[in-house]
Amino acid sequence: MKTQIKTTTILFTLLISMSAFAQTLKEARNFTDNEQYEKARGVFKLLLAKEPTNGDNFFYFGDLMLKMEYPDSAKILFQKGVDINATNALTHVGLARYYMYTWNDPKGAQEIAYAKSLVQTHAGKKGLDMAASRQVQIYLEIAETETWAVSPNYDDAINLTTVCEKLDSKNPEVFLVRGDSYYRKDPVNGTPAITSYNLAAKLDPKSCQANVRIGKLYANGKNMQSAIGFYNIAIKTDSTFAPAWRLKGEAQYSIMKFDSAQKSMATYLRLNDDPTARYNYCKALYKGGNYSDAIVQGNLALDKDSSITVVYRIIGRCYIESKTPDAVKSIEYFNKFFAKQKISGAPVVIADDYIDRGKAFSKNNQDSLAILDYLKALNVDTSRKDIYFDVATSYYKMKKYDKAAEFYKKKIDLNPANATISDWNAYGRTLFAQKDYANADLAFRKFTTMDPLNSIGWYWRGRANQYLDKELKSDSTRIFFETFFDLADKDREKNKKELITASIYLGGYFNVKKNFPCSKAYFQYSLDLDPANPANVDVKKILETDKDIKAATAADINTCRSTAAGGK
């Protein structure tokens, strides 16, 4: 009798222990979903200590590390799971997720194929029978993972949810994952995704996940009012779900409802004030263009946990992208980012990290360092040839005009049909600085053909031809400067420097042509525009000492015009 009571007591204790463990694993996943990452991490550490051979623990802990942007830590956990329990399909899904997160699709696909084979081996086999709920769990994680790839396999992900529906048609997760796959496959047509999300909501009306996803769908489509409406429905369903408040705040920021956004974010932080939450708030502020507040929140996140390396990146960007850039502070934070990243290996360095620091270096007139960073960016991502313009500009500032011209031309040659007036203007200016006036004029001609009402293109055609035709054999220079003059005279203050150059040339031109009234008119225009300009010292002498000009009556400048430049 005593033995029977003792056995019953042990079994009862075991059942309670197993139930507590199951709830704890569920709790850890709930913390993860609720973006309470520090709490989740604490629970996962306890789980690993309690059941160090349970592969699921390693999978979900590794997944948390990916969400926290610690891929190296995630890989260690996923690999440990495989080493400890190689027949647990989820551990292989974890490795697949890591590989696809780090752009290694082939290895990811191998792990997914192996995970599927494990499910098929265990499903329906005597002694190995895998429950339908377990098959669904694994297939849904595979489906989600397949949408992470560089070349996502959306169709297989959707097909897997169909398999899952046959196994368990009442599981709302099936329809959430299907909705995610549909939306990622076709972000323009959100109807299939919304249909799936609504099915999930019907199956689990106490969950806010479906309406949060519908809200995100509308937010991605820039329909913020509808997005906020669905976030409100989600919050009404579960007011403790922190991400709904964060997403609502982000949507409110994007439509400049700043007071409402701050209230939403305050609730988000009240529900979840761990360092990652502060990081998420910082990121939302940055995306909304609220750089000063993003810097404040970023530093608060770092005060809580200085190991969140990505925050240094965001603050560095804020300083260089603000209306009043602080290049020195931007460089400081990017330097900290690179130093921390080198130690932790996370997050992955991307081309934009070097590009943004390069822009800060250039803004701080450290263009040799800027060029080094731009070239590092190209090593990281060879497709980022859009930075050729930035490289060229730094070379131009350093007066290395040959290298500047080389990179401006590279930028143009990427797609000549899409070259902008800025491209042609910069290229022409660089050739002009090299005294290659003929090719400079060709570049400026492209400029004026594309935008004939932009005065600066005509100005630079005049400057180039001024050197090409020093003996005034052609009227081209005159025509270009006159066309510039007509366009620029409407805003004299803005164009003062260039107007003085053009009017002095035209004054000299008419003097040589012995049209003294027009010569006097242009010289007088230049002097009146800015008497203190050094170029007008000689102009004043000419007006006072040249007997022909002195004797002439200044003409109305409008009567001195020739025909417009047209197709010259």
What are the language-model segments listed below?
Residues 551-556:
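Flexible, disordered linker segments and immediate boundary regions flanking tandem C2H2 zinc-finger modules
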